Amino acid sequence: MMNRTTPDQELVPASEPVWERPWSVEEIRRSSQSWSLAADAGLLQFLQEFSQQTISRTHEIKKQVDGLIRETKATDCRLHNVFNDFLMLSNTQFIENRVYDEEVEEPVLKAEAEKTEQEKTREQKEVDLIPKVQEAVNYGLQVLDSAFEQLDIKAGNSDSEEDDANGRVELILEPKDLYIDRPLPYLIGSKLFMEQEDVGLGELSSEEGSVGSDRGSIVDTEEEKEEEESDEDFAHHSDNEQNQHTTQMSDEEEDDDGCDLFADSEKEEEDIEDIEENTRPKRSRPTSFADELAARIKGDAMGRVDEEPTTLPSGEAKPRKTLKEKKERRTPSDDEEDNLFAPPKLTDEDFSPFGSGGGLFSGGKGLFDDEDEESDLFTEASQDRQAGASVKEESSSSKPGKKIPAGAVSVFLGDTDVFGAASVPSLKEPQKPEQPTPRKSPYGPPPTGLFDDDDGDDDDDFFSAPHSKPSKTRKVQSTADIFGDEEGDLFKEKAVASPEATVSQTDENKARAEKKVTLSYSKNLKPSSETKTQKGLFSDEEDSEDLFSSQSASNLKGASLLPGKLPTSVSLFDDEDEEDNLFGGTAAKKQTLSLQAQREEKAKASELSKKKASALLFSSDEEDQWNIPASQTHLASDSRSKGEPRDSGTLQSQEAKAVKKTSLFEEDKEDDLFAIAKDSQKKTQRVSLLFEDDVDSGGSLFGSPPTSVPPATKKKETVSEAPPLLFSDEEEKEAQLGVKSVDKKVESAKESLKFGRTDVAESEKEGLLTRSAQETVKHSDLFSSSSPWDKGTKPRTKTVLSLFDEEEDKMEDQNIIQAPQKEVGKGCDPDAHPKSTGVFQDEELLFSHKLQKDNDPDVDLFAGTKKTKLLEPSVGSLFGDDEDDDLFSSAKSQPLVQEKKRVVKKDHSVNSFKNQKHPESIQGSKEKGIWKPETPQDSSGLAPFKTKEPSTRIGKIQANLAINPAALLPTAASQISEVKPVLPELAFPSSEHRRSHGLESVPVLPGSGEAGVSFDLPAQADTLHSANKSRVKMRGKRRPQTRAARRLAAQESSEAEDMSVPRGPIAQWADGAISPNGHRPQLRAASGEDSTEEALAAAAAPWEGGPVPGVDTSPFAKSLGHSRGEADLFDSGDIFSTGTGSQSVERTKPKAKIAENPANPPVGGKAKSPMFPALGEASSDDDLFQSAKPKPAKKTNPFPLLEDEDDLFTDQKVKKNETKSSSQQDVILTTQDIFEDDIFATEAIKPSQKTREKEKTLESNLFDDNIDIFADLTVKPKEKSKKKVEAKSIFDDDMDDIFSTGIQAKTTKPKSRSAQAAPEPRFEHKVSNIFDDPLNAFGGQ
């Protein structure tokens, strides 16, 4: 070709430069002597062309070879086909030959023999044929008599039987049920099958003796009689029989005269048939006892059969058999009326037992045993039989989804077992009577409600049917089976602890949430081991019970709300919506959950790592994930605190779980920085929340309520959660720190009553109140934290929490905020300390005090809680105003109300809201949006809240509360108004602030003003509005939104926050928080925790410094934040401008404090992880943008959620890191301050701290701080030291562990290094990730 081209090229040269065309070999040779650059170019062209030709030629050859291979393969295939054809032919011929040989041989021989026989015996044969024919006829008649019932159309026309043909023509033969005399064995797997060794086959002999033998004997005797009589006195027997049945068969007596063997046999047959026929007609017109018996039996059988079909699809065959058996028994009864009458009585009795559920025979019963058994299943709830049937259907449908996934126990067995285990314990105390029908017994009490709830429970009986909740609880427990006994036990305990229905419902939700978590998270984590761990966690079922006994009160209160939750449970079953159903904690959510489940599952698939965090959305998931971080944090804390009063067994189990989860989640964490934020948070809450959940509930609870609420909102609110999480988280944190501080104070009052501990109860009450109160309260939060806290309890708590308690939590928060608001200064601590005074000192009393909650606190605490819940309406207005109207503005206005309660909350909220003021207008729509992401957060927890407007308000308030810890202070009130609007993302103002500032540094914050909208994604905000009740809807969206929107909103809102933070209290605490943010873009990026702490400290500072620094409502701000929070407040102001200096100062404090208060940073981290899982996801979304993004720098986790988790955990990790580094320590302290300021943060931190403190010192002060959120400044120092003591190791170990799988302890120092070193890069990453991750969080939006 070249030679070809060469001449052309040589001809062409004149027209084009020589160097632009490939040269030919000849040209190259010619110019070899006078080589030039053009020759080089030509040579290059030549070589390139040569290469291309070689490649193309190679491809051609390759194609040819491929074609050859294909042809070879096709040839081989055809060859094998031919072989196979030959083999088939050979086999066929072989078989045919064998068959033909045999056939040929036999016919020939037979034919010959027959011929000889025929020839010899034709006459004889005829003679012989007569008896043979007679015998055959007799046999045939016997068969007709024995195997067929003759429906005698001519029952009255037996005269016409004279014409055998006519009689036969008119005869209608109905085959008898062969299985009356010889019943089939029971259905395999049925109760009777399991219980009886003969599986219904051996009972034939026994029951045949009575019934079967009567039948058999009757039929046999009848047949024998008929044979004998037909041979001998067929007419006589007919006469006897007909004399017996004379009334029945007066016409047949005429036929009795016809005594031909065949006529008699036929008559006998017809008589029998007539008798049977008459019996049947008698059934319609029962004239004789046999008829009545038959009719009655038939009725019973029909009733049974009818029942059976409803109860047992498999029973359908049996009902037929039963009917046949009944018919046949009736027939024998009719055939031998005297004998039959006695036996039919027996038969009738048997039938009546059968009808009554005994079964014709035990075997018959076996046939119907399932029916009867199922009837029995529902028979105990016989009222519920229909309910049972529908329940079974529901259970089957829902259970399979549920049970199969995690528990994967048989739907029925699982349910029965789960409910046997779960419901039996539930039944155990309240429902023990109905243990036989575990499922039903839960249902049994409200059988109608069962179905109403079951059917409507998902949607209609959301709130109306706690009863069905039990059924669903059973289902959930079957689902809980996933958590097998744990949740089953939880449910048992819960059912016992709570009103069985309510608790069960709660359990269901928990189970669902937990299953979801366990499923989604445990899928990674080995749900079974996790379940086992959880079970171990709830091996202290008393505690679970206690949690739920207190929750039970909450559940009782929230029973109607819980039913809404229950729908979640239902959805839980429906979902594997579950994941959504967690969110669909509301009944309607089920549908929403389906959508969200799809959404979220898709998101989970795509954001599986992220959406492990998203999985946090599922309270269970988030709880699991949270629990692991909480658990991990709590693991360290718990391992440290194992010996502490907190249930060591539970702790250890939970720790084991936490350990599992830690490692599991550490994997997830790395993967799921987003998810880890949630995953770790989930982990944190799981392990931490499991034990620390309440302790961590303060933090994890906060984080977790944020997680729970945010987890609900997590995926949605991960994007939109910055405000919602900020709000929800911060609000939740602050609500939980503030509100929950108040709530805990109220709840502490409750839980003090419950737990009766003020000091330890304070520190632990933070955790335990958070557990118990927050379990109660945060049973809504349970979704977020209490659930994680008690994973087993979590289902309970969560269930209680999800619909009820989050709402309750928020309502309680609000109520506590309102009432405790008032109480906070006066009543919160009093409420909390008197009641929590001694209780928390015994950590184990946590659970036993939860039991106390059932016992003592139920009245007081729940009086408090109930008050809180009663306050809920006002809280509704509180939250309604604050959250609905004033996510940003009403929260401002309301903050006054809320401010008291949420002095911390609202201060933070104010700060957040100030920062969020830009978003405020957005959050006007966003309020509901963010609020609703909050509500999705609440979705888990607020599902109950859904019933209340506060749900959205709560979301808002939680968003506000996220900020509100500062707002909780009176001073913060004004700030709240100012600040609240500014920061949807500043809902976790500090964190968000820091984030914002960090984002400001990395100008991603411009959208921060719109972050609220961006967070919520107004559409989702609208969804969230309805999400209150159908949180699932929002959650599906919210998760992605939370991440994407939160990140975008965190960027924009943070920038807006950074801009708006300076003003008003935000400038105050935003100085602390934002300067930390501004300072923390790096620091916060490096140490998102510190930023969060600083932000929290800053947030705490306003209410702390502004409202009552001494009262520092947030325990964090109090103990840590007070020393550091005041510094943060003012240093935060300085931090705002001199954030580094302030942070350095703060950090130096924190260094000392963090050195002292490793627990504090860990608590901060934990709080942050709890806070920031939700709050931290909001805040850490800013942090995501900063700390989490620095974490991306660390982990290069693209997902803000992961980063958020990292950030959350970076806050925590960074707190640890910062604990290591003074700047970061300052941030940590600030974060802790913020956490202290943020009741939510404080509680979040405190729970970690508490967990650690409890674990280390049973930090009563933490809870005191929580209780003294408003008045606990004094306790704060204890918290500090305890935080110092515990936080470091706990935080380092747990938080790092929790938040960074690999970064546990090492992360603390590496993190501080990487946090400071990578703060800006991370922040840059986060900024990029803010947009990238949010898009990713949104799935590419």
Swiss-Prot record:
Short motif (LFa 18): ranges: 1234-1240
Motif mapping: LFa 2: 411-419
Residue ranges annotated as motif LFa 12: 839-847
Chain location of the short sequence motif LFa 15 per the record: 1129-1136
Skewed-composition ranges (Polar residues): 519-536, 1135-1145
Motif (LFa 5): 537-548
Motif LFa 4, chain ranges: 482-491
Spans annotated as Required for interaction with F-actin-capping protein subunit alpha (CAPZA1 or CAPZA2 or CAPZA3): 1029-1047
Positions of region (Sufficient for interaction with CCDC93): 356-600
UniProt region (Disordered), positions on chain: 202-405, 422-609, 621-662, 696-734, 751-796, 820-840, 886-951, 988-1205, 1302-1326
A Pfam entry, by short name: CAP-ZIP_m
Region of interest (Interaction with phospholipids), ranges: 937-1339
Basic and acidic residues bias spans: 233-242, 293-307, 507-517, 598-609, 637-647, 751-768, 823-834, 898-909, 917-931
Motif LFa 11, residue range(s) on this chain: 803-817
Predominant location category: membrane
Similarity section: Belongs to the FAM21 family.
The protein's name in its UniProt record: WASH complex subunit 2C
Organism: Homo sapiens (Human)
